[in-house]
């Protein structure tokens, strides 16, 4: 009986807890939606972009990892590179949430235009892997996948299983 009551209690309180939007995300919600729709169109996958920011920095615009900084965790090299591709990002400040959101969305769009895959789910898996590890590594992984008689257009159980990256980079970028 006691186990049943604990189960009922946990069942009813777990749903609201799991369904909560991270409080930290709310201050960026309007900007994320606006920039997403400007860059990706009215059908922009805003929840996917929100999940990406949550994974990258937990909505902390001052976040620092070993190699990257800011809300969308740009490395110094990628931040320097992206302003050459997108001059409108010229006033680089990885700690500025608006800059960081726009840079992430533009980079995702740039990757989306260059990656071929067998469907939207595979496409986004490859985009997100490339976001963290670079497009060159994805292209190498796809070539290795093809050389092993697997499908280079499918991420799951195919491209995701092949890489010549070092162990730490493989873990970081998968």
Sequence positions of predicted segments:
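Positively charged n-region of N-terminal signal peptides that target proteins for export
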Residues: 1-4
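Non-catalytic cell-wall polysaccharide-engagement segments
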Residues: 19-31, 38-40, 77-174
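N-terminal targeting signals for Sec/Tat export/insertion, comprising classic cleavable signal peptides
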Residues: 27-50, 64-68
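Short, functionally critical alpha-helical segments immediately adjacent to catalytic or ligand/cofactor-binding
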Residues: 43-60, 104-105, 127-132
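Short, surface-exposed helix-loop/turn micro-motifs enriched in polar/charged residues
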Residues: 44-45, 63-66, 71, 92, ...
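Cell-wall polysaccharide-cleaving catalytic domain and substrate-binding groove, primarily
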Residues: 54-78, 84, 134
């Amino acid at each position: 009986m006691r186990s049943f009551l604990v189960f009922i209690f946990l069942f009813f309180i777990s749903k609201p807890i799991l369904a909560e939007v991270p409080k930290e995300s709310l201050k960026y919600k309007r900007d994320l939606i606006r920039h997403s729709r400007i860059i990706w169109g009215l059908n922009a996958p805003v929840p996917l972009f929100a999940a990406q920011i949550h994974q990258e920095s937990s909505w902390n615009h001052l976040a620092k990892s070993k190699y990257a900084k800011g809300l969308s965790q740009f490395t110094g090299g990628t931040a320097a590179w992206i302003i050459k591709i997108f001059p409108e990002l010229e006033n680089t400040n990885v700690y500025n949430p608006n800059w960081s959101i726009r840079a992430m969305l533009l980079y995702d769009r740039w990757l989306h235009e260059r990656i071929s895959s067998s469907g939207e789910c595979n496409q986004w898996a490859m985009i997100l892997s490339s976001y963290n590890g670079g497009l060159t590594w994805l292209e190498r992984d796809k070539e290795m996948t093809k050389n092993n008689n697997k499908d280079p257009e499918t991420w799951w159980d195919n491209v995701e299983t092949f890489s010549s990256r070092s162990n730490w980079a493989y873990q970081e970028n998968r």
